[in-house]
Regions:
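Surface-exposed beta-strand edges and their flanking turn/coil or helix-capping segments
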Residues: 3-4, 32, 102, 114-115, ...
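Basic side chains
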Residues: 43-46, 60, 102, 135-136, ...
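The feature marks non-catalytic terminal segments
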Residues: 121-181
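Residues that form or immediately flank small-molecule/cofactor binding pockets and catalytic motifs
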Residues: 22-24, 105, 128, 162
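Catalytic subdomain that performs nucleotidyl-dependent activation
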Residues: 68-148
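ATP-dependent adenylation/nucleotidyltransferase module used to activate substrates
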Residues: 1-74, 80-83, 110-118
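Short, basic, helix/turn surface patches
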Residues: 42-53, 90-96, 143, 147-162
């Protein structure tokens, strides 16, 4: 897939840019027919990214997960794992000695798209051949439908996560709840 638009933006902004080449697609779509290719792919992609981060001498990485990602992960965890869980805002990876932060956790996907449109930022489409036909897409569509049927439900789901005493999440504070009730 063509990353040229992102590369050009980074050059224009004078931001260092690295591409990590992997064989993840070959692993995921081999004859083994992985039962849960999305989960394995996510783990392998994060592993490759985190390894590059360490090679660059960094000890912290910011993932771009937004509020909708957190809600969708919670829905997936409830449906497929039977637990109330979503990834935490800050995670320390012991084996990598790397801190993962998610600074966009209070930003909705719609706000991200609005920012992208306002500033005419380039978009590189997901090259995955199953994009749009995944369990995550199912969760995204389900949350969208629930929010259409029950306006405000998505924000209430996020508030439930903030208040849910999920391992790795900070204790509930009014600051976190502000605007998400």
């Amino acid at each position: 897939f063509d990353l040229t638009p992102v590369k050009l933006l980074c050059e224009h902004l004078q931001v260092e840019y690295h591409v990590v080449s992997t064989e993840i697609a070959k692993i995921i779509f081999s004859d083994k027919n992985e039962a849960s290719p999305c989960s394995l792919c996510a783990k392998l992609r994060k592993g490759a990214l985190n390894q590059k981060i360490k090679e660059l001498g960094c000890n912290k990485v910011a993932y771009a997960h937004h509020m909708d990602d957190i809600i969708e992960t919670m829905v997936l965890s409830m449906i497929f794992e039977g637990r109330f869980y979503s990834f935490s805002p800050v995670t320390f990876l012991d084996r990598m000695e790397l801190t993962v932060i998610r600074p966009m956790m209070y930003v909705s996907e719609a706000e991200v798209k609005g920012f992208r449109n306002k500033y005419n930022l380039p978009v590189v489409e997901n090259p995955c051949p199953v994009d749009g036909a995944t369990k995550r897409q199912y969760a995204k569509d389900l949350v969208r439908q629930i929010n259409l049927d029950h306006p405000g439900a998505k924000k209430r789901m996020f508030t439930a996560i903030l208040d849910g005493n999920i391992p790795g999440w900070p204790e509930k504070t009014e600051h976190k709840r502000k605007g998400h009730q």
